[in-house]
């Protein structure tokens, strides 16, 4: 079966084949076991509502469930059979709290810790003297991406269009250099973000490279690149025309939600105005979350550039978000060089040498970041008051 009992708390698992993600996150291996004797008689369709899943739970974890009020609260008690020993805290209560009231609850000391509290509330509680605020970098990055092609559903692959509006490399690089991300972070995020340079946060020390600078703010370089690419202001109105001297504008797609969504996109528009590029909102407004991704994935012709974010998994295989055949390669970029560099990241050599994948990943990032297709903007910190 591939399973071997070593002792009462240890099982050895043998595999006939392993993937390249084994060194970073287990390659999707299940990290917990389910008790067959406890669940085998429950039909799959009834599992979610079963009390053996919702309240009378057998678990390997430090706590067991006492009661569960769906969408409201969870009562926990220490598990005396936990493999590290019974926890010293006997019980815990987890409550779902409206973001409008969580800060006032923190002020009164009602809760010992708040998890997943919106970062835009940070300013309202950061100076409270009854809190100690901890934080860590999330496995996340926000980015700006340019549409350079379409996804061919028949062929099942991304087709890059050399005549797409955003196909010019120097144009994309100029727009990347034209955004002052450092200023944006200070103005909108209270220090809870920092400028990103790669599609992997520094938390992955082995894969992150300080030698890849990304696109630090450089408006003069941006203007130079636009001049070289043939985008020049021919009528003196402050905005550059395209290579043929015709009016040129970049259509932005950005998501609605939160107090800073609108000011943030206006910041982008103003920044690009300063290098002579006219930018407007696609659809004339911010786009609701689900509609936004529907439009992006459908390659809506009204979108030239969009602002979004990725959660970063531990597998660190970029083929899902940047591969030739991936529907989630939203810029729709494909090239032989990209294929070659990505293939090395999942090469069998990664299993022979734990360092091989990290070096292959950095080589791919050097190439891909320079293409300015999906430009990393910020890394984010999650906080625990």
Language-model region placement:
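Surface-exposed binding/hinge segments that line
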Residues: 1-42
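Ligand-site clamp/hinge motif
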Residues: 51, 79-124, 278-280, 285-287
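Gly/Pro-rich hinge or "lid" segments in bacterial periplasmic/extracellular proteins
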Residues: 28-87, 91, 101, 219-224
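A bilobed periplasmic-binding-protein/Venus flytrap-type ligand-binding module shared by bacterial periplasmic
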Residues: 77-80, 141-170, 187, 212, ...
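Acidic-aromatic pocket-rim loops
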Residues: 136-156, 290-349
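Extracytoplasmic/peripheral linker and loop segments enriched in polar/acidic and small residues
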Residues: 2-4, 8, 164, 169-173, ...
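Bilobed periplasmic-binding protein-like "clamshell/Venus-flytrap" ligand-binding domains
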Residues: 20-26, 186, 229-255, 303, ...
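Append "and occasionally in soluble cytosolic enzymes with long acidic Gly/Pro-rich linkers
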Residues: 77-80, 165-270, 274, 337, ...
